[in-house]
């Protein structure tokens, strides 16, 4: 499994390619092409990289809490897991981690971590540190 930081670094380096593309097109193609759109795309990609990092960090740490490798948090205790998922976890111990991870990612996939408030909400699922 890739670390959240490695996933972020890979996404961030792809953003650097957009920056280079902007520099090239603005210097060499400004008469026929408005390269400012590339800058907008770069900003969107960088925000997306941060969002992906927080999603991956929260998902991996929540799984670690579930496995007993991290302490439970107040918000983690309130995270809703459907009865059907918990039944699968109990009845299929060989796939319990995968089942739980899939459900976490399904629910977190609805969230966006693009503001300081939403990022703090995600971190509270995995840490009781005061934010």
Please report, for each region that a protein language model flagged, where it lies by residue.
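Charged alpha-helical initiation segments
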Residues: 1-44, 56, 67-69, 73-77
């Amino acid at each position: 499994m890739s670390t959240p930081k490695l996933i972020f670094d890979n996404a961030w380096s792809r953003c650097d390619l957009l920056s280079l593309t902007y520099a090239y097109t603005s210097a060499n193609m400004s008469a026929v092409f408005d390269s400012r759109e590339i800058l907008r795309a770069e900003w969107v990609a960088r925000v997306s990289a941060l969002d992906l990092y927080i999603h991956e960090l929260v998902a991996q740490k929540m799984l670690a809490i579930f496995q007993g490798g991290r302490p439970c948090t107040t918000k983690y205790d309130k995270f809703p897991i459907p009865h059907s998922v918990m039944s699968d976890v109990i009845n299929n111990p060989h796939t319990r981690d995968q089942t739980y991870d899939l459900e976490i990612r399904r629910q977190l996939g609805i969230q966006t971590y693009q503001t300081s408030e939403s990022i703090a909400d995600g971190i509270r699922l995995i840490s009781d540190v005061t934010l």
